[in-house]
């Protein structure tokens, strides 16, 4: 769809890639057949992934965010994603160029192709048509606005409080890993009841700590207008922002401009 996928097409063309328009009813079947007959040839929609990963490169760009920082930001973005039984969103972080979009929403090529074929009654896998649409919310870990959001989240949580909960999680994780290492060579019936109780206790404690941190991060995310704006811009680029959500986006945009 040249209109709905315009931003993805434009970015691909700016990189010097040729983009084929394949919107016929049989095109899904044709490209699958063509790929099977030509080893090493692969087709992908322009919105199947971020432009840096549509065609894999040997050189990898460095990620500005640490794994811990990504874990902090994931619930923040999750909090403002659409809640719909027909759509599933998964937040991932990629080391894109800082001048690229801060948030991009993509849809897995395989799942998209299977659902399209299922809709036509082909592919031999009709159950794909009953599955929710699955999207990746790709957050650009090198974008200045993402760094700004991280700073706001850390300040909003409180440096000492965040450090404290992270330390508790790290300690509980270490304790659980140590116990699992101790028990790894034992069969379940060989594990003493006290050890089983300890394992359950550690697992429950770690789960509660993570839920506590996630709940606080989601609260901060829901109140962050910049997060909502970036997600809505990505949804808008993918043609998925409509109705009430579109109206809220317009109102928020006006408020942010007035400031």
Q: Could you describe each region identified by the protein language model?
A:
Residues 1-259:
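Long, intrinsically disordered, charge-dense linkers/tails
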